[in-house]
Regions:
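ATP-dependent small-molecule kinase phosphotransfer cores
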Residues: 27-81
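C-terminal helical "lid" subdomain and adjoining coupling/linker elements of P-loop NTPases
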Residues: 180-191
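Glycine-rich phosphate-binding P-loop
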Residues: 1-14
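Small-molecule kinase domains that catalyze NTP-dependent phosphoryl transfer to phosphate-bearing small molecules
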Residues: 47-51, 122-167
Length: 191
């Protein structure tokens, strides 16, 4: 989700509407801390990409290291319906038939107004914060997946929450889930 698009709020409301668990980076990190598995994957939960020079030199080792947090997320969430905010979940669960991946985005001006209002900062500060956060998320996603963050081909659904609002975004996601369930239950008959 783009920073300031309301993606976290959307995820919370979808989880609430469906009566399922929500996991964001803090929830997952807390779960791992309680299991004693946090320290070795700390940078994953802090959204810190590796140093770019080290990244190039140790790419193969990074791939092995990257598998660990993915395996942990699968283990934490297995056998339950849940909403996962971020954490490259679109890639982690890509081959799971039951998963739905959504990218929530919005026009920069709307995101600036939202962040300035919620954080009580100037619009100039909000824009800087948005650009820094989006850049960090892009680098993080690219490092851990090798894919471009926000590329619609990496998600089943990409929604502009700035155009339709948070509540309609939630409803659109729930409607999509119902349509996907219908399609699966009908045996995927061609149109």
């Amino acid at each position: 989700r783009e920073y300031g698009s309301g993606g976290h709020d959307v995820g919370e409301r979808v989880a609430e509407k469906l009566g399922i668990v929500l996991y964001d980076k803090d929830d997952l990190a807390e779960k791992l801390k309680s299991l004693g598995d946090y320290e070795e994957v700390k940078s994953f939960y802090e959204e810190r990409p590796a140093n770019s020079l080290l990244y190039v030199i140790a790419r193969e080792e990074d791939r092995k290291m990257n598998e660990k947090p993915f395996e942990q997320i699968k283990s934490i969430t297995e056998n339950q319906s849940c909403v996962i905010i971020g954490r490259c979940a679109n890639v982690i669960f890509r081959n799971e038939e039951e998963h739905i991946s959504v990218f929530v985005h919005a026009d920069l001006e709307k995101r600036i107004k939202r962040i300035a209002g919620t954080n009580r900062i100037s619009e100039k500060e909000a824009e800087l914060l948005i650009r820094e956060t989006d850049k960090r998320r892009d680098e993080f996603h690219n490092q851990y997946t090798g894919e471009n963050w926000g590329d619609s081909r990496g998600y089943q659904l990409s929604v502009d929450s700035g155009m339709i609002g948070i509540e309609q975004t939630v409803q659109l996601i729930c409607d999509y889930m119902e349509a996907k369930k219908w399609w699966r239950d009908c045996g995927r008959q061609g149109i």
